[in-house]
Amino acid sequence: MTQISERLLVQAHLAAKQPRVLSEQESAEHRAAIAAELKAQNAVLVAHYYCDPVIQALAEETGGCVSDSLEMARFGNQHPAQTVVVAGVRFMGETAKILNPEKRVLMPTLEATCSLDLGCPVDEFSAFCDQHPERTVVVYANTSAAVKARADWVVTSSCAVEIVEHLMDNGEPILWAPDQHLGRYIQRATGADMLLWDGACIVHEEFKAKQLEDMKALYPDAAILVHPESPESVVALANAVGSTSQLIRAAQTLPNSTFIVATDRGIFYKMQQLCPEKTFVEAPTAGNGAACRSCAHCPWMAMNTLERTLACLREGSGEIFVDPALVPRAVRPLKRMLDFTQAARLRLAGNA
């Protein structure tokens, strides 16, 4: 997908899919109705840290999960509910369905996609892989089910470095897709032989080093937290680099009282919940309005609203289906990731 067509697509979503603002009473009524439907349908709501705060709060209040994509996958896989409602973007719903083919997986909207997914079409990616058959194919979770089915491993940003180190120790050269910035970060961290696909996240690519330096001058005592999907020049300014869950832990453990945060502002809900005495400031992006494709908030994550969540439960709309022919091939690299991270957890527990 070209930069121009991607920009037009995102702006179309921003223009046409702006959610209706609910009154306080309407919001409370929707939350109560969603909670009742979840209970009646033996359903659980899982929400990503980048969703709007009202959705994250509802997931917590109803016994669901608010987490990064790795823990969303793990939670949906282990929870006994027969229906999983995934508030996030489409690849997260697909992942839940691949890992739980016997469960019903709903999403508030099927239009909530991801620029990384859009930028890695399976036909082009498969041809790229075929040109480099000697390489182990490692793909980021932010990809379609079809791309996952072409991979040897799936990773999230919270486990990517460890898995690539494991493969490097085995002497395996790697073909990486789709996020070029995360790929370069992993490459620098591990020294691995990695061939990178040319993709990027529209949210993180807009963070700018020069403006970040200027903001740091305004908050000289602030720590800078950066997601590794950001450009290298932004990562270089960070006091802590990591996945969403890792950045939240950094906010809890670093002694600073102020943080400049270079990731989607949806994460502020959990940071402020866990660190109410601390101040969190959005890192600067390319600007506002037409010049800014995301302005530190994913337009597709913003499509997960209370109204759409209630509608998907009442109407059964937004159900995720994955081609059964893809499932056995897509589940294999996902299970490898889950098994690897579970083993790593056990090793850490044993060393505690």
From Swiss-Prot:
It comes from the Bacteria. Keywords: 4Fe-4S, Cytoplasm, Iron, Iron-sulfur, Metal-binding, Pyridine nucleotide biosynthesis, Transferase. Its EC number is 2.5.1.72. GO terms for biological process: 'de novo' NAD biosynthetic process from L-aspartate. It catalyses: iminosuccinate + dihydroxyacetone phosphate = quinolinate + phosphate + 2 H2O + H(+). Its cofactor is [4Fe-4S] cluster. Binds 1 [4Fe-4S] cluster per subunit. One of its GO terms (cellular component) is cytosol. Iminosuccinate binds at H48, S69, Y140, A141, N142, S157, H227, P228, E229, T244. GO terms for molecular function: 4 iron, 4 sulfur cluster binding; metal ion binding; quinolinate synthetase A activity. Pathway: Cofactor biosynthesis; NAD(+) biosynthesis; quinolinate from iminoaspartate: step 1/1. It is found in: Cytoplasm. Pfam families: NadA. [4Fe-4S] cluster binds at C114, C201, C298. InterPro entries: NadA, NadA_sf, Quinolinate_synth_A_type1. Transmembrane segments: none annotated. Catalyzes the condensation of iminoaspartate with dihydroxyacetone phosphate to form quinolinate. Belongs to the quinolinate synthase family. Type 1 subfamily. This is Quinolinate synthase. It comes from Pseudomonas paraeruginosa (strain DSM 24068 / PA7). The lineage of its organism: Bacteria, Pseudomonadati, Pseudomonadota, Gammaproteobacteria, Pseudomonadales. The gene is nadA.
